[in-house]
């Protein structure tokens, strides 16, 4: 996903970069220089067979990722870059807020690239095996865990970043909530999680079940407090 490398990390992540899913905010950051563009789009050793750019909250009439993709594909003939359609992104957004059971107008939270990648996989794969993704309760079960958020840098730890993001009531990514939704989808869509295994942590819930996560509880408390303050005033 995004700019995650394989070089020097082959023992953990392998060498395949068949598909690379990139968020629209990361796309221009990854393509600033000709060297970077060749790395992702042209070099046989490092380019992906297919680059998928998903874009959320963009102006569809002034869609800069679409322009960049056309330019890069005209320069690098081996590059294959696809953009998620407006219809697909609206569907993804509806699924996101529907699973959260929250009105979009009430918050400024957004989908992660992991969410976009999972939905891409659901669209194109018959079965899905996911490696290296922790389940919703992993951090509470491993309070001393110090694994980094990105395997290729040590800027911050995964669990601390997830927890702080989850506690932000009205903005940011909701990584643990997304993972709770993936656990719900596992049986529905044939998703299998490895390293760590999610056995014993799958929700086995119905299609209409709304997940109850740290973010959902935090948001519910916020709404109740706001309603209480409104009543008092």
PLM regions and their residue ranges:
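Metal-ion/cofactor- or nucleotide/acyl-coenzyme-handling active-site neighborhoods
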Residues: 1-233
């Amino acid at each position: 996903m995004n700019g995650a490398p394989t070089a020097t990390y082959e023992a953990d992540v392998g060498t395949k970069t068949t598909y690379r899913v990139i968020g629209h905010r990361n796309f221009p950051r990854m393509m600033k220089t000709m060297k970077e563009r060749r790395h992702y789009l042209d070099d046989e050793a490092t380019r992906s067979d297919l680059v998928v750019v998903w874009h959320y909250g963009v102006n569809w009439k002034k869609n800069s990722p679409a322009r960049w993709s056309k330019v890069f594909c005209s320069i690098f003939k081996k590059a294959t870059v696809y953009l998620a359609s407006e219809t697909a992104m609206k569907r993804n957004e509806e699924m996101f807020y529907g699973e959260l059971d929250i009105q979009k107008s009430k918050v400024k939270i957004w989908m992660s690239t992991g969410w976009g990648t999972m939905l891409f996989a659901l669209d194109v794969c018959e079965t899905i095996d996911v490696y290296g993704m922790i389940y919703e309760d992993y951090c509470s079960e491993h309070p001393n865990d110090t694994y980094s958020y990105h395997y290729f840098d040590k800027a911050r730890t995964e669990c601390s970043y997830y927890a702080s993001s989850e506690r932000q009531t009205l903005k940011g990514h909701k990584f643990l909530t997304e993972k709770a939704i993936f656990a719900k989808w596992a049986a529905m869509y044939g998703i299998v999680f490895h390293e760590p295994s999610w056995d014993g942590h799958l929700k086995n819930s119905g299609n209409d079940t709304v997940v109850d996560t740290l973010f959902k509880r935090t948001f519910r408390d916020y709404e109740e407090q706001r309603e209480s303050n409104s009543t008092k005033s």
